[in-house]
């Protein structure tokens, strides 16, 4: 059950959602635009909402930021759980249910291409900071390649071909590539009798550089990882085990990566987000309803603490699972899945300025580059809420597409799991 718990807690919340599919009566939200004060002019931007379908292929909804309207709907594979936007190569989606990755142009209603993976791969995560490459994290066993562990595959984005696949640990749940094409760090939930490990891979060859275990100073139950802006450090969120508390481990990359330092977190940390504008790291602590905020510009593993906290943990709503900051540096937004709302927090005073009611079970939040809109996916509410930042109110609620294409009445809806913007 420990491994299952970690998988469900994996933010991005694809796996949080999977535990809730098919539960209860389905609420069917309707788009309800609210006219904002004076309008909010902006450049052309889009938000891409990933929808899970328990009864067929999933989809991606593309929303025009300027009009809060659906521009197009693209079909994905079976069981889509994660999406990644590569500026030069479009949007990629990991389809765990049929061992594929979908790709389509991000700026137009273009054709969807499909990259096939090895049978049994069950892709769950995507990452890349290296032009021309997309790394796919596969949680399943592949009899012809990795019959007793997970794996990482490298897709050459120009051709859509898988160039290499390498074995990692058991039940990998998350990974990150260090900035500027650095090493790849894979979090394996099933290793060491469920205590976890981190596999460090060469990004060119996918050869294993080192495996970091609890005996090397790694905290128990690693669940999420984020790279520093310059790639010097990898920040790994570990949940602990009920006896050992959660912690933020700071890892180095290179020929001999190590767990260089660690700082305590709140109870039940699940997710981290790097605000590249202010160079801050945010960690959601779902167990005690707080967010930890760190100064990621001032990391020194020889100091105590090795990464300074900018405030006491910020008390937010119930069960925070997602966080994102405005590019203008004024506020950050926290999705609280247990209280069905979003906390709006000042980036200077760290005071909660407002609590915004959204749909049921909000799990993921993203801001668009113009800092005018915030997008919140509500998987149990079958909707996406759009918050207008001029007054921090919900301007529009967009219903998810029907599970059965073409359905027009009393339709069961798909379930939005995450959103990315450009």
Residue ranges of model-derived segments:
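Predominantly soluble domains enriched in secretory-pathway, periplasmic, or organellar proteins
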Residues: 23-422
């Amino acid at each position: 059950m420990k491994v299952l718990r970690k998988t469900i807690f994996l933010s991005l919340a694809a796996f949080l959602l999977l535990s809730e599919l098919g539960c209860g009566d389905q609420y069917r939200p309707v788009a309800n635009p609210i006219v904002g004060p004076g309008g909010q002019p902006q450049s052309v931007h889009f938000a891409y909402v990933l929808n899970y379908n328990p009864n067929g292929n999933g989809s991606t909804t593309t929303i025009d930021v300027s009009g809060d309207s659906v521009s197009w709907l693209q079909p994905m594979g079976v069981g889509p759980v994660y999406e990644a936007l590569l500026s030069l190569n479009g949007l990629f989606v990991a389809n765990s249910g049929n061992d594929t990755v979908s790709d389509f142009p991000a700026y137009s209603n273009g054709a969807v291409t499909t990259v096939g993976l090895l049978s049994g791969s069950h892709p769950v995560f995507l990452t890349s900071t290296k032009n021309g490459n997309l790394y796919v994290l596969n949680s399943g066993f592949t009899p012809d390649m990795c019959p007793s562990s997970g794996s990482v595959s490298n897709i050459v984005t120009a051709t859509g071909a898988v160039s290499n696949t390498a074995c990692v640990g058991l039940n990998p749940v998350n990974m990150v590539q260090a900035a500027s094409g650095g090493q790849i760090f894979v979090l394996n939930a099933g290793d060491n009798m469920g205590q976890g490990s981190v596999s460090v891979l060469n990004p060119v060859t996918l050869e294993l550089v080192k495996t970091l275990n609890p005996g090397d100073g790694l905290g128990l139950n690693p669940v999420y990882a984020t790279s520093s802006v310059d790639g010097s450090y990898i920040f790994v969120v570990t949940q602990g085990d009920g006896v050992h508390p959660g912690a933020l481990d700071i890892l180095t990359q290179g020929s001999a990566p190590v767990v260089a330092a660690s700082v305590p977190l709140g109870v039940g940390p699940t997710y981290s987000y790097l605000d590249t504008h202010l160079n801050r790291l945010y960690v959601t602590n779902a167990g005690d309803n707080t967010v930890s905020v760190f100064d990621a510009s001032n990391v020194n593993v020889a100091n105590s603490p090795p990464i300074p906290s900018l405030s006491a943990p910020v008390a937010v709503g119930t069960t925070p699972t997602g966080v994102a900051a405005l590019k203008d540096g004024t506020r950050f937004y926290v999705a609280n899945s247990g209280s069905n709302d979003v906390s709006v927090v000042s980036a200077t005073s760290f005071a909660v300025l407002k609590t915004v009611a959204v749909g049921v079970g909000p799990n993921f939040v993203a801001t668009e580059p113009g800092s005018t809109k915030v997008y919140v996916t509500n998987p149990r509410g079958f909707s996406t809420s759009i918050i207008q930042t001029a007054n921090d109110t919900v301007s529009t609620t967009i219903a998810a597409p029907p599970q059965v294409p073409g359905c027009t009445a009393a339709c069961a809806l798909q379930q939005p799991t995450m959103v990315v913007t450009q």
